[in-house]
A protein has these predicted regions:
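A structural feature that tracks compact, well-ordered secondary-structure segments
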Residues: 24, 63, 73-79, 88-90, ...
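A short, glycine/Asx- and small/polar-enriched loop/turn
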Residues: 68-70, 180-183
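Catalytic micro-motifs at enzyme active sites that drive phosphoryl/nucleotidyl and oxygen chemistry
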Residues: 8-9, 58-64, 92-93, 121-123, ...
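Long, hydrophobic/aromatic-enriched structural stretches that serve as scaffold segments
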Residues: 45-79, 83-84
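A common structural junction motif
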Residues: 91-99
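Short S/T/G/P-rich N-terminal loop/turn motif that feeds into the first structured element of a domain
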Residues: 1-53, 81-84, 103-165, 177-181
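Short connector loops at helix/strand junctions that flank enzyme active sites
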Residues: 67-71, 100-102, 131
Length: 187
């Protein structure tokens, strides 16, 4: 079976999508490799990402110099958690994969908002990825859930309206309650 077949096909008709934000730390030993070796390893890694990108959305971001626990992040959006796991396995089998260690991994799922049907998450749009992304796990307080639903809905509508004032910002809210330690992942 080829790597393309193992990763599988993305179905665009599914309404359930899974999101994975994987941050990777690069072993300092990587810097000691010769330039030709690093270049070949980078080509191998990028080739793998290109193949996987035909089966799911993958967005890559550099965190170099911005975080001390990661040099890059992969944001995967797929109709299957297994596709993400296959890609992770394949990453670790590459030359570069021998020099990376995951520092943080967040898993979440898409779901229609309880509060508004006016929001289409940025990841669901057929647009190229933005140059920058801010990713953060979010936990709502117990007090939030004790508020009446209509009050929460109104506050969320106000929040959405503020976001609409900045069309260059895309909202990406996904749900991780019961999957991970946070209620939501925001990007």
């Amino acid at each position: 079976m080829s790597s393309t077949e193992e990763i599988g096909k993305t179905t665009t008709t599914t309404s359930q999508l899974y999101l994975n934000f994987s941050f990777f730390k690069v072993d300092p030993k990587w810097r000691w490799l010769n330039e030709i070796g690093k270049e070949e390893a980078a080509k191998e890694f990028l080739g793998l990402i290109e193949v996987a990108s035909t089966k799911m959305k993958i967005r890559t971001y550099s965190t170099l110099g911005l975080r001390d626990d990661a040099e890059f992040m992969l944001w995967m959006i797929s109709d299957s958690i297994e596709k993400m796991q296959i890609l992770a396995s394949k990453i670790y089998s590459t030359v570069l994969g021998k020099y990376v260690e995951p520092s943080q991994i967040y898993l979440s799922a898409s779901r229609a908002s309880l509060y508004s049907n006016k929001v289409v998450p940025g990841f669901a749009m057929d647009e190229p990825p933005m140059k920058y992304v801010i990713v953060y796990p979010f936990v709502k307080s117990r007090e939030w859930y004790l508020l009446p639903f209509e009050e929460r809905r109104k506050m969320m509508e106000e929040h959405i309206m503020v976001g609409r004032k900045f069309p260059q910002v895309r909202l990406n809210t996904s749900y991780s309650f019961g999957i991970d330690d946070q209620d939501f992942m925001l990007a």
